[in-house]
Amino acid sequence: MWQRHRRTILLILFFGGFLWFAYWFNRLPAPYAAREESPFRPSNTVRDHIPALTDPSFESVVSADQYLTDDGFGIDVAVEGYRRFYPVQVLVWHEAVNDTFRGKPLLVTFCPLCRSGAVYDRRVDGTEMTFGTAEEVWNSNILLYDKKTNSVWSQLDGIARRGASLGKSLAPYPSRWMTWADWKHAYPTGEVLSRNTGFVRDYTLDPYGAYRTNQQVWFLVAKKDDRLATKERVFGVTLGKASAAYPEKAFVTKSILHDVIAGRPVVAWKDEDTGSVSAFARNTAAHVLTFRSEKAGFVDAETESVWTSDGAAIKGPLKGTRLERLTTVPSFWFCWFAAHPDTQLYSR
Protein backbone atom coordinates (compact mmCIF):
# COMPACT_ATOMS: atom_id res chain seq x y z
CA MET A 1 0.00 0.00 0.00
CA TRP A 2 2.78 2.42 0.99
CA GLN A 3 4.71 1.70 -2.20
CA ARG A 4 1.65 2.56 -4.31
CA HIS A 5 1.12 5.84 -2.44
CA ARG A 6 4.84 6.60 -2.68
CA ARG A 7 4.77 6.21 -6.47
CA THR A 8 1.68 8.44 -6.65
CA ILE A 9 3.37 11.15 -4.58
CA LEU A 10 6.53 10.98 -6.69
CA LEU A 11 4.49 11.27 -9.89
CA ILE A 12 2.63 14.30 -8.53
CA LEU A 13 5.92 15.96 -7.53
CA PHE A 14 7.48 15.16 -10.91
CA PHE A 15 4.63 16.53 -12.99
CA GLY A 16 4.20 19.51 -10.66
CA GLY A 17 7.86 20.38 -11.11
CA PHE A 18 7.56 19.90 -14.86
CA LEU A 19 4.57 22.25 -15.06
CA TRP A 20 6.39 24.87 -12.97
CA PHE A 21 9.42 24.69 -15.26
CA ALA A 22 7.20 24.83 -18.34
CA TYR A 23 5.50 27.96 -17.03
CA TRP A 24 8.77 29.85 -16.67
CA PHE A 25 10.24 28.46 -19.89
CA ASN A 26 7.22 29.52 -21.94
CA ARG A 27 6.81 32.83 -20.15
CA LEU A 28 10.29 34.03 -20.99
CA PRO A 29 11.05 34.74 -24.65
CA ALA A 30 14.35 33.75 -26.22
CA PRO A 31 17.00 36.27 -25.13
CA TYR A 32 18.74 38.53 -27.64
CA ALA A 33 20.98 41.58 -27.74
CA ALA A 34 19.07 44.81 -27.06
CA ARG A 35 17.78 46.48 -30.22
CA GLU A 36 15.23 49.14 -31.07
CA GLU A 37 11.55 48.34 -31.62
CA SER A 38 8.07 49.40 -30.47
CA PRO A 39 8.04 50.12 -26.72
CA PHE A 40 5.01 47.89 -26.03
CA ARG A 41 5.43 44.11 -26.04
CA PRO A 42 3.28 41.25 -24.70
CA SER A 43 4.87 39.80 -21.57
CA ASN A 44 3.73 36.22 -22.27
CA THR A 45 1.61 36.24 -19.11
CA VAL A 46 -1.98 37.09 -18.34
CA ARG A 47 -3.04 39.94 -16.09
CA ASP A 48 -2.26 39.28 -12.41
CA HIS A 49 -0.46 36.01 -13.20
CA ILE A 50 2.36 37.52 -11.16
CA PRO A 51 0.39 38.37 -8.02
CA ALA A 52 0.89 41.84 -6.58
CA LEU A 53 0.58 42.02 -2.79
CA THR A 54 -2.15 43.94 -0.99
CA ASP A 55 -2.24 44.72 2.75
CA PRO A 56 1.04 42.86 3.32
CA SER A 57 2.31 41.59 6.64
CA PHE A 58 5.71 42.38 8.13
CA GLU A 59 8.24 40.62 10.31
CA SER A 60 11.13 41.58 12.55
CA VAL A 61 14.75 41.91 11.49
CA VAL A 62 15.63 38.83 13.57
CA SER A 63 12.96 36.76 11.82
CA ALA A 64 13.79 37.98 8.30
CA ASP A 65 17.49 37.40 8.90
CA GLN A 66 16.81 33.66 8.89
CA TYR A 67 16.45 33.65 5.10
CA LEU A 68 17.56 36.99 3.62
CA THR A 69 21.11 37.10 2.24
CA ASP A 70 23.41 39.87 3.45
CA ASP A 71 24.34 40.96 -0.08
CA GLY A 72 20.73 40.88 -1.29
CA PHE A 73 19.15 44.24 -2.10
CA GLY A 74 15.87 45.80 -1.13
CA ILE A 75 13.97 49.07 -0.94
CA ASP A 76 14.16 51.20 2.20
CA VAL A 77 11.16 53.42 2.97
CA ALA A 78 10.73 55.84 5.87
CA VAL A 79 7.50 57.41 7.13
CA GLU A 80 7.56 59.67 10.21
CA GLY A 81 10.88 58.16 11.28
CA TYR A 82 9.68 54.55 11.04
CA ARG A 83 11.44 52.22 8.59
CA ARG A 84 10.37 49.35 6.36
CA PHE A 85 12.48 47.13 4.13
CA TYR A 86 11.03 45.45 1.04
CA PRO A 87 13.51 42.72 0.02
CA VAL A 88 14.07 41.91 -3.64
CA GLN A 89 13.93 38.23 -2.67
CA VAL A 90 10.18 38.77 -2.15
CA LEU A 91 9.58 41.56 -4.67
CA VAL A 92 10.99 39.55 -7.58
CA TRP A 93 8.01 37.19 -7.25
CA HIS A 94 5.33 39.88 -6.90
CA GLU A 95 6.65 43.10 -8.51
CA ALA A 96 4.24 45.40 -6.65
CA VAL A 97 3.13 45.90 -3.05
CA ASN A 98 0.01 47.90 -2.21
CA ASP A 99 0.92 49.04 1.28
CA THR A 100 -0.39 51.53 3.82
CA PHE A 101 2.47 52.74 5.99
CA ARG A 102 1.35 54.81 8.99
CA GLY A 103 -1.70 55.95 7.05
CA LYS A 104 0.17 56.72 3.83
CA PRO A 105 -0.98 54.65 0.81
CA LEU A 106 2.19 53.54 -0.98
CA LEU A 107 2.95 51.44 -4.04
CA VAL A 108 6.33 49.72 -3.71
CA THR A 109 7.50 48.36 -7.06
CA PHE A 110 10.30 46.29 -8.50
CA CYS A 111 10.94 45.34 -12.13
CA PRO A 112 13.07 42.18 -12.48
CA LEU A 113 13.71 43.01 -16.16
CA CYS A 114 15.26 46.40 -15.34
CA ARG A 115 16.34 45.66 -11.74
CA SER A 116 14.64 48.93 -10.89
CA GLY A 117 12.97 49.77 -7.61
CA ALA A 118 10.60 52.72 -7.17
CA VAL A 119 7.96 53.83 -4.67
CA TYR A 120 4.88 55.96 -5.33
CA ASP A 121 1.89 57.45 -3.57
CA ARG A 122 -1.10 55.29 -4.62
CA ARG A 123 -3.45 58.25 -4.82
CA VAL A 124 -4.43 59.63 -8.23
CA ASP A 125 -6.46 62.86 -8.25
CA GLY A 126 -7.23 62.23 -4.59
CA THR A 127 -8.50 58.68 -5.15
CA GLU A 128 -6.61 55.77 -3.59
CA MET A 129 -5.78 53.11 -6.18
CA THR A 130 -4.92 49.43 -5.94
CA PHE A 131 -2.53 48.06 -8.54
CA GLY A 132 -1.93 44.69 -10.18
CA THR A 133 0.50 43.39 -12.79
CA ALA A 134 -0.38 43.87 -16.46
CA GLU A 135 0.04 41.46 -19.36
CA GLU A 136 2.57 43.53 -21.32
CA VAL A 137 5.79 45.46 -20.86
CA TRP A 138 6.89 48.92 -22.00
CA ASN A 139 10.52 49.31 -23.05
CA SER A 140 11.29 46.07 -21.18
CA ASN A 141 9.81 47.65 -18.05
CA ILE A 142 6.87 46.00 -16.32
CA LEU A 143 3.48 47.68 -16.54
CA LEU A 144 1.05 47.86 -13.65
CA TYR A 145 -2.66 48.49 -13.98
CA ASP A 146 -4.94 50.26 -11.54
CA LYS A 147 -8.15 48.41 -10.68
CA LYS A 148 -10.34 51.51 -10.89
CA THR A 149 -9.70 52.77 -14.45
CA ASN A 150 -7.69 49.82 -15.87
CA SER A 151 -5.03 52.29 -17.01
CA VAL A 152 -1.52 50.83 -17.28
CA TRP A 153 1.45 52.56 -15.66
CA SER A 154 5.17 52.07 -16.26
CA GLN A 155 7.04 50.98 -13.15
CA LEU A 156 10.21 52.97 -13.81
CA ASP A 157 8.61 56.41 -13.81
CA GLY A 158 4.99 55.95 -12.67
CA ILE A 159 3.45 57.39 -15.85
CA ALA A 160 0.18 56.08 -17.29
CA ARG A 161 0.98 54.77 -20.76
CA ARG A 162 -2.51 53.63 -21.76
CA GLY A 163 -6.09 54.02 -20.61
CA ALA A 164 -8.27 56.72 -19.09
CA SER A 165 -5.36 58.11 -17.04
CA LEU A 166 -3.01 58.38 -20.05
CA GLY A 167 -0.26 60.91 -19.34
CA LYS A 168 -0.93 61.22 -15.62
CA SER A 169 1.88 60.53 -13.16
CA LEU A 170 2.00 58.86 -9.78
CA ALA A 171 3.74 61.04 -7.20
CA PRO A 172 7.14 59.51 -6.35
CA TYR A 173 7.83 58.76 -2.70
CA PRO A 174 11.44 58.87 -1.42
CA SER A 175 13.15 55.50 -1.11
CA ARG A 176 16.65 54.08 -1.00
CA TRP A 177 18.27 51.01 -2.54
CA MET A 178 20.20 49.12 0.14
CA THR A 179 21.67 45.72 0.93
CA TRP A 180 20.11 43.68 3.69
CA ALA A 181 23.40 43.76 5.64
CA ASP A 182 23.49 47.56 5.62
CA TRP A 183 19.80 47.95 6.38
CA LYS A 184 19.58 45.56 9.31
CA HIS A 185 22.67 47.17 10.84
CA ALA A 186 21.25 50.69 10.44
CA TYR A 187 17.64 49.90 11.44
CA PRO A 188 17.56 46.85 13.75
CA THR A 189 14.06 47.73 15.02
CA GLY A 190 12.58 48.27 11.55
CA GLU A 191 9.94 46.14 9.85
CA VAL A 192 10.58 43.79 6.92
CA LEU A 193 8.07 42.72 4.28
CA SER A 194 7.14 39.19 5.36
CA ARG A 195 7.69 36.08 3.28
CA ASN A 196 4.29 34.94 4.58
CA THR A 197 2.48 36.37 1.57
CA GLY A 198 -0.28 33.80 1.18
CA PHE A 199 1.41 32.44 -1.96
CA VAL A 200 3.58 29.35 -2.28
CA ARG A 201 6.96 30.66 -3.46
CA ASP A 202 10.57 29.85 -2.69
CA TYR A 203 11.82 33.25 -1.58
CA THR A 204 15.40 32.01 -1.47
CA LEU A 205 15.31 31.46 -5.25
CA ASP A 206 15.56 34.04 -8.04
CA PRO A 207 13.32 32.73 -10.86
CA TYR A 208 15.18 34.93 -13.38
CA GLY A 209 18.41 32.99 -12.94
CA ALA A 210 21.43 34.58 -14.61
CA TYR A 211 19.41 37.34 -16.30
CA ARG A 212 20.80 40.11 -14.09
CA THR A 213 24.43 39.15 -14.73
CA ASN A 214 24.46 38.61 -18.51
CA GLN A 215 24.01 41.22 -21.27
CA GLN A 216 20.97 39.68 -22.94
CA VAL A 217 17.47 41.15 -22.73
CA TRP A 218 14.08 39.49 -23.16
CA PHE A 219 12.03 42.34 -24.63
CA LEU A 220 12.73 44.91 -27.31
CA VAL A 221 13.07 48.61 -26.55
CA ALA A 222 12.26 51.72 -28.58
CA LYS A 223 15.66 53.40 -28.11
CA LYS A 224 19.12 52.16 -27.16
CA ASP A 225 22.48 53.71 -26.42
CA ASP A 226 25.92 52.08 -26.37
CA ARG A 227 27.78 54.54 -24.15
CA LEU A 228 27.43 52.03 -21.33
CA ALA A 229 27.03 48.27 -21.32
CA THR A 230 23.42 47.15 -21.69
CA LYS A 231 23.00 46.12 -18.05
CA GLU A 232 25.41 48.48 -16.39
CA ARG A 233 23.86 49.70 -13.16
CA VAL A 234 22.93 53.38 -12.97
CA PHE A 235 21.04 55.62 -10.61
CA GLY A 236 18.54 57.59 -12.67
CA VAL A 237 17.65 61.05 -11.38
CA THR A 238 14.77 63.20 -12.62
CA LEU A 239 14.31 66.94 -12.26
CA GLY A 240 11.07 68.07 -13.88
CA LYS A 241 11.14 66.70 -17.42
CA ALA A 242 14.94 66.46 -17.45
CA SER A 243 16.96 63.49 -16.23
CA ALA A 244 20.47 62.23 -15.68
CA ALA A 245 22.07 58.83 -15.13
CA TYR A 246 24.90 58.23 -12.67
CA PRO A 247 26.79 54.95 -13.17
CA GLU A 248 27.09 52.93 -9.99
CA LYS A 249 30.81 52.55 -10.65
CA ALA A 250 31.25 56.36 -10.42
CA PHE A 251 30.65 56.10 -6.68
CA VAL A 252 33.53 53.66 -6.21
CA THR A 253 36.15 56.43 -6.36
CA LYS A 254 33.95 59.36 -5.28
CA SER A 255 31.18 59.47 -2.71
CA ILE A 256 29.93 62.86 -3.96
CA LEU A 257 29.12 63.78 -7.58
CA HIS A 258 28.39 67.42 -8.42
CA ASP A 259 26.43 68.05 -11.58
CA VAL A 260 23.96 70.36 -13.34
CA ILE A 261 20.61 69.12 -14.72
CA ALA A 262 18.60 71.47 -16.94
CA GLY A 263 20.58 74.41 -15.57
CA ARG A 264 19.99 73.43 -11.94
CA PRO A 265 22.97 72.51 -9.72
CA VAL A 266 22.52 69.04 -8.22
CA VAL A 267 24.49 66.64 -6.08
CA ALA A 268 24.33 62.86 -5.90
CA TRP A 269 26.04 61.26 -2.94
CA LYS A 270 26.61 57.86 -1.45
CA ASP A 271 26.08 57.38 2.26
CA GLU A 272 29.02 55.24 3.33
CA ASP A 273 27.13 54.02 6.42
CA THR A 274 24.19 52.58 4.47
CA GLY A 275 25.62 52.24 0.94
CA SER A 276 22.59 54.13 -0.42
CA VAL A 277 22.65 56.82 -3.12
CA SER A 278 20.48 59.94 -2.97
CA ALA A 279 20.31 63.09 -5.10
CA PHE A 280 19.36 66.68 -4.27
CA ALA A 281 19.23 70.15 -5.77
CA ARG A 282 22.23 71.87 -4.17
CA ASN A 283 21.16 75.48 -4.32
CA THR A 284 19.66 77.48 -1.46
CA ALA A 285 18.28 81.01 -1.51
CA ALA A 286 21.79 82.44 -1.11
CA HIS A 287 24.24 79.73 -2.18
CA VAL A 288 25.14 77.09 -4.71
CA LEU A 289 26.68 74.49 -2.44
CA THR A 290 29.76 72.34 -2.99
CA PHE A 291 30.14 69.36 -0.67
CA ARG A 292 32.85 67.20 0.80
CA SER A 293 32.50 64.09 2.94
CA GLU A 294 33.67 64.11 6.54
CA LYS A 295 33.13 61.84 9.52
CA ALA A 296 30.41 64.15 10.84
CA GLY A 297 28.50 64.04 7.55
CA PHE A 298 28.47 66.00 4.30
CA VAL A 299 29.93 69.50 4.72
CA ASP A 300 29.39 72.38 2.31
CA ALA A 301 32.38 74.59 1.47
CA GLU A 302 30.32 77.77 1.31
CA THR A 303 29.05 77.86 4.92
CA GLU A 304 30.72 74.84 6.59
CA SER A 305 27.27 73.55 7.55
CA VAL A 306 26.97 69.82 8.22
CA TRP A 307 24.32 67.83 6.33
CA THR A 308 22.84 64.36 6.78
CA SER A 309 22.54 61.88 3.93
CA ASP A 310 18.83 62.83 3.80
CA GLY A 311 19.73 66.41 2.82
CA ALA A 312 19.08 68.10 6.18
CA ALA A 313 21.50 70.63 7.67
CA ILE A 314 22.05 69.75 11.33
CA LYS A 315 24.90 72.09 12.24
CA GLY A 316 26.21 75.47 11.10
CA PRO A 317 24.67 78.61 9.58
CA LEU A 318 22.22 76.60 7.45
CA LYS A 319 20.98 74.40 10.31
CA GLY A 320 17.31 73.56 9.77
CA THR A 321 17.55 73.90 5.98
CA ARG A 322 16.51 70.97 3.79
CA LEU A 323 17.71 70.40 0.25
CA GLU A 324 15.11 69.54 -2.38
CA ARG A 325 15.23 65.78 -2.77
CA LEU A 326 15.21 64.46 -6.34
CA THR A 327 13.65 61.17 -7.43
CA THR A 328 16.42 58.58 -7.66
CA VAL A 329 15.82 55.13 -9.17
CA PRO A 330 18.33 52.27 -9.58
CA SER A 331 18.10 50.62 -12.99
CA PHE A 332 19.91 48.86 -15.79
CA TRP A 333 21.25 51.43 -18.28
CA PHE A 334 19.31 50.08 -21.26
CA CYS A 335 15.99 50.44 -19.43
CA TRP A 336 16.73 53.91 -18.12
CA PHE A 337 17.79 55.20 -21.54
CA ALA A 338 14.81 53.63 -23.33
CA ALA A 339 12.47 55.43 -20.94
CA HIS A 340 14.52 58.67 -20.95
CA PRO A 341 16.22 58.94 -24.38
CA ASP A 342 17.19 62.57 -23.71
CA THR A 343 18.89 61.73 -20.42
CA GLN A 344 22.34 63.11 -19.75
CA LEU A 345 25.03 60.67 -18.64
CA TYR A 346 27.49 61.60 -15.91
CA SER A 347 30.98 60.77 -17.17
CA ARG A 348 33.50 62.85 -15.21
Predicted regions and their residues:
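Mid-to-C-terminal functional-domain signal that highlights helix-capping/loop sites
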Residues: 5-348
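N-terminal secretory signal peptides that target proteins for export/translocation
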Residues: 1-3
